[in-house]
């Protein structure tokens, strides 16, 4: 027989009159639902707080690693300068440079600003364009080796049995020993989407700065590719932020015999622009460092007869 909750009072004849009765199980179920809703609210709030704390913790750890890397680099430089006094200055200088370069690249892999080349779109490229892309990857790595503040470079969705991988190995001496991260995984599964900025010339937003806690994605397409908006479309489908280099904000079209103007850059050229901006915090210097004169653009301050943007 089901238990019941009796609520009542005394009747005129001294007896007990039941005013209301309800199954105890129903009341307990109602209370249980209320508690569950409260717990769910608490869990959501706690989850949001935890994510913020974890993000701050990761950023703090990355900054700490950068400081440690710089201190280690300085110690290594001093140590090498004290060693091998009988070695010629030229030999010692070469050894020091090589050791410091390695130390910087390892420090970047531990805590550097992350930049990824998205190599998932090679089906749109011809054999010739894939060879050009491999050459651009080589130049990109060469620039990173020379940088005062190298990036932590990722090559994503690069399969070992692909034509691009074979071109990279054949064209780039020591490619398999590059101090970068090469993976068959997609960048979308490696990084939090809210921290990603996909750089594409088709984006409406101009890149204002280079932030240490963001991940910058470059589409692995060469500047000869005729397909339009491939990387932009992919980024929008995945729901990540897109941005373009601020060419329109700092440069103008320059008259030339072919009337040729292009904002499509090789990945190593975009990389050089980001490296220079990170060192100088000056977009005019950065754009001048990476955009070849043949693209038909000059700095606004240097243009004598700029053409209007069409």
Curated annotation (Swiss-Prot):
Designated name of the protein: tRNA methyltransferase 10 homolog B
Free-text function comment from the UniProt entry: S-adenosyl-L-methionine-dependent guanine N(1)-methyltransferase that catalyzes the formation of N(1)-methylguanine at position 9 (m1G9) in tRNAs. Probably not able to catalyze formation of N(1)-methyladenine at position 9 (m1A9) in tRNAs.
Species in which this protein is naturally found: Danio rerio (Zebrafish)
UniProt similarity note: Belongs to the class IV-like SAM-binding methyltransferase superfamily. TRM10 family.
Pfam family, one: tRNA_m1G_MT
Keywords: Coiled coil, Methyltransferase, S-adenosyl-L-methionine, Transferase
GO MF terms held by the record: tRNA (guanosine(9)-N1)-methyltransferase activity; tRNA binding
Protein EC: 2.1.1.221
InterPro entries in the record: MT_TRM10-typ (IPR028564), MT_TRM10-typ_sf (IPR038459), Trm10_B_MTase_dom (IPR047911), tRNA_m1G_MeTrfase_euk (IPR007356), tRNA_MeTrfase_TRMD/TRM10 (IPR016009)
Example GO biological process: tRNA N1-guanine methylation
Gene Ontology CC annotations of this record: nucleoplasm; nucleus
Domain of life, source organism: Eukaryota
Name of the gene: trmt10b
Reaction catalysed by this enzyme: guanosine(9) in tRNA + S-adenosyl-L-methionine = N(1)-methylguanosine(9) in tRNA + S-adenosyl-L-homocysteine + H(+)
Coiled coil: 55-94
Gene3D superfamilies noted in UniProt: 3.40.1280.30
Stretches assigned to the SAM-dependent MTase TRM10-type domain: 101-298
UniProt cross-references to CDD domains, sorted A to Z: Trm10euk_B
């Amino acid at each position: 027989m089901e238990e019941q909750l009796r609520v009542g009072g005394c009747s005129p004849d001294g007896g007990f009159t039941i005013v209301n009765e309800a199954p105890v199980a129903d009341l307990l179920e109602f209370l249980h639902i209320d508690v569950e809703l409260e717990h769910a609210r608490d869990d959501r709030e706690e989850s949001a707080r935890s994510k913020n704390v974890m993000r701050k913790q990761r950023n703090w750890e990355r900054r700490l690693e950068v400081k440690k890397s710089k201190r280690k680099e300085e110690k290594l430089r001093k140590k090498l300068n004290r060693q091998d006094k009988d070695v010629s200055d030229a030999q010692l200088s070469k050894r020091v440079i090589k050791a410091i370069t390695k130390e910087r690249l390892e420090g970047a892999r531990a805590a550097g600003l992350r930049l990824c080349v998205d190599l998932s779109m090679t089906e749109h490229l011809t054999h010739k364009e894939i060879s050009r892309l491999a050459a651009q990857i080589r130049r990109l790595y060469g620039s990173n080796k020379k940088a005062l503040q190298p990036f932590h470079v990722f090559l994503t969705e690069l399969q070992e049995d692909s034509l691009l991988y074979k071109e990279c190995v054949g064209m780039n001496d020591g490619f398999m020993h590059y101090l970068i991260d090469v993976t068959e995984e997609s960048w979308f599964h490696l990084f939090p989407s809210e921290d990603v900025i996909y750089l594409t010339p088709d984006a409406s937003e101009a890149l204002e700065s280079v932030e240490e806690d963001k991940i910058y994605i470059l589409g692995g397409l060469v500047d000869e590719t005729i397909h339009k908006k491939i990387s932009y479309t992919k980024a929008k489908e995945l729901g990540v932020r897109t941005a373009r280099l601020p060419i329109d904000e700092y440069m103008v079209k320059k008259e030339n015999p072919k009337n040729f103007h292009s904002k499509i850059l090789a990945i190593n050229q975009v990389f050089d622009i980001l490296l220079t901006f990170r060192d100088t915090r000056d977009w005019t210097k950065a754009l001048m460092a990476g955009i070849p004169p043949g693209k038909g653009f000059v700095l606004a301050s240097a243009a004598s007869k700029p053409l209007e943007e069409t």
